[in-house]
């Protein structure tokens, strides 16, 4: 088995999908998880205005609405959370995503004070934080807020990790990589876009340039620039297609580099890192 085949197997990616079937499968998955855990009544998800959180949010709201209808239990709620650092440059996109999702509840937690306070405390201790590291603090602070909400609201935190993100390790360890449930796992970027099209999302929500937008000194840095490879190449690779040797080497480099992010903390029994 080639490395490409092994990665595809691990991430469960299909070469082609039926978007309607995947929508139904995902909604049922989200419903089943809450039914299985009767002490949970809500899903919590940060909404940025990008493709991934828009899709995960819409599917979560659909699942919650069906659960309420099927059980008559109005305690089932989907809580969308805006988590800007100060003023978000593409706030209009986030509002457009919320209008599409129509969440039961929307909360806004501005993380700037918490992040800046942490950076200042570290500086007082003699630790200068790089812009890149500060970006990871932002991602982790967003998850602190989401878990605080979930803890108070009998909730589970939804993550937006999908195959094209997982393969490159393009997420913050214990930040956006830390969640309770990953409804988009198995889908690549273009497949997620296909689901949003079927769901009737405004094209602007899935055609915009993907960006983590975590670094102050590189605002709106495109994912593809940061990774050095296009999502088209990543998606093709995940669908078992041939791509250029340069693109393949870049993707596989990121796969190996990000292995530690795909595991629980390393124990003496682990050998994947050797």
UniProtKB/Swiss-Prot annotation:
Q: How does it assemble?
A: Homodimer.
Pathway recorded for this protein: Cofactor biosynthesis; NAD(+) biosynthesis; NAD(+) from deamido-NAD(+) (ammonia route): step 1/1
Binding, ATP? 46-53, 160, 189, 211
Question: Which catalysed reactions does the entry list for this protein?
Answer: deamido-NAD(+) + NH4(+) + ATP = AMP + diphosphate + NAD(+) + H(+)
GO CC list: cytoplasm
- Which residues are noted in the entry as Mg(2+)-binding? 52, 165
Stated name of the protein: NH(3)-dependent NAD(+) synthetase
Give the record's GO biological process terms: NAD biosynthetic process
Query: What CDD domains does its record include?
Result: NAD_synthase
List the source organism.
Streptococcus pyogenes serotype M18 (strain MGAS8232)
Ligand binding (deamido-NAD(+)): 140, 173, 180, 260-261
Which GO MF terms does the UniProt record name? ATP binding; glutaminase activity; metal ion binding; NAD+ synthase (glutamine-hydrolyzing) activity; NAD+ synthase activity
Identify the EC number(s). Answer: 6.3.1.5
InterPro entries (UniProt xref): NAD/GMP_synthase (IPR022310), NAD_synthase (IPR003694), NH(3)-dep_NAD(+)_synth (IPR022926), Rossmann-like_a/b/a_fold (IPR014729)
Question: What is the purpose of this protein?
Answer: Catalyzes the ATP-dependent amidation of deamido-NAD to form NAD. Uses ammonia as a nitrogen source.
Q: Which family does it belong to?
A: Belongs to the NAD synthetase family.
Report keywords, A-Z: ATP-binding, Ligase, Magnesium, Metal-binding, NAD, Nucleotide-binding
Q: Which Pfam families match?
A: NAD_synthase
